[in-house]
A protein has these predicted regions:
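Residue-identity detector for glycine
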Residues: 13, 19, 36, 65-66
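Leucine-biased recognition of intrinsically disordered, low-complexity hydrophobic segments
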Residues: 38, 45, 55-56, 68
């Protein structure tokens, strides 16, 4: 026996059904958008080491334009793009690849690209990563100077990787900003060569001393591009203006003029990196004052870790930091030890 034919839905009824379906779809979209945003915030603020690799935050755009999470690895960028160059550099596990990355491509992915927040870099087997670094003591012996330079080499490596990381993590940032990150990454690689060359002249090689991924333990907590430049350019690289001047004097005192010259050269080039951060923090947040910068640092970082002594005021002023900013930075005291 044949089933009775269903009665056709009248146009008015069809319209009501479609309207109800559309309302339900909008509600689902709104719910997933909010859930995705909450997930992003939690993932960004969590300690990276506590986020399992199965929850690597690859994301996709919702119809509303928000980024929503997908389980599994982030999507791999297309070959021949700047994004793929950055991806390959961060994930590279060969020392030669870290020291000599491929030439930077000219092509970019389309404007709407997924967020790719890589949780950790590839590490060459030569580098022995430890949980706690050994502090550099005296520089009189070549081994002491080589150890210090090895630490600085690894700082530059992490800086290069994190510039590439930010290029992938913040695809919604202006193209010119992301292009600048790639250029700075190339500068950091050049600095690595300066350090590696002098380490070799002292009779040592990359990998003879342990390293710590201190920057990687902290910087990926940055929630947006402004937070990133606050941490790296206005924080870490600004502090290096003091550290490079201090170590240049110490190397010269130890009779190592070449080591002192390298410190001075890198310190001078850091001014441009800090200026880049000043420019973009102002562009992204409309204003750069001490308090807005301090609040942009991801916990537990604070201004105490982003300055050396004595403050290199002239270099910082050349980089675009104001007298008022420097006065507050110099005077700032943490609420508790270790902040």
């Amino acid at each position: 026996m044949s089933s009775p034919e269903p009665s056709p839905v009248q146009p008015a009824g069809r319209a009501r059904c479609q309207g109800a379906w559309q309302d339900a779809a909008r509600a689902r979209t709104e719910w997933t958008w909010r859930a995705g945003r909450l997930w992003q915030i939690v993932a960004c603020l969590s300690r990276p080491e506590n986020v399992t690799r199965s929850l690597v935050d690859s994301v996709a755009r919702s119809p509303r334009g928000a980024y929503l999470p997908r389980m599994g690895e982030p999507s791999v960028p297309a070959v021949g793009t700047v994004e793929r160059w950055a991806w390959d550099y961060v994930r590279c596990e060969h020392l030669e690849g870290k020291l000599r990355p491929a030439p930077l491509p000219e092509d970019w992915e389309p404007e709407i690209a997924p967020v790719r927040r890589l949780l950790a870099p590839g590490r060459p087997p030569e580098l022995r990563v430890v949980a706690k670094a050994v502090k550099t003591r005296g520089l009189a012996a070549p081994s002491g100077r080589a150890r210090a330079l090895h630490t600085f080499f690894h700082h530059e490596l992490q800086a290069a990787e994190l510039m590439a990381w930010a290029l992938l993590a913040f695809p919604g940032a202006p193209r010119e900003f992301r292009r600048g990150l790639a250029r700075i990454a190339q500068d950091e690689v050049r600095h690595m060569h300066l350090y590696a060359g002098h380490i070799a002249r002292l009779g040592f090689s990359i990998g003879q001393f342990p390293v710590r991924d201190w920057f990687w333990e902290r910087v990926p907590r940055c929630v947006d591009a402004a937070s990133f430049v606050a941490t790296m350019g206005l924080g870490v690289e600004s502090a290096n203006l003091e550290h490079s001047a201090s170590f240049a004097a110490r190397f010269r005192e130890a009779g190592d003029e070449e080591g002192a010259r390298i410190q001075e050269q890198i310190g001078s080039e850091e001014i441009g990196h800090v200026r880049f951060a000043v420019t973009w923090f102002q562009a992204l947040r409309s204003n750069l004052d001490f308090e807005s910068w301090r609040l942009a640092l991801p916990a537990p970082l604070s201004p105490a870790l982003m300055r050396g002594k004595p403050l290199q005021r002239e270099a910082r002023l050349r980089a675009g930091q104001s007298e008022a900013f420097l006065d507050e930075l110099e005077a700032w005291q943490p609420d508790s030890p270790g902040s």
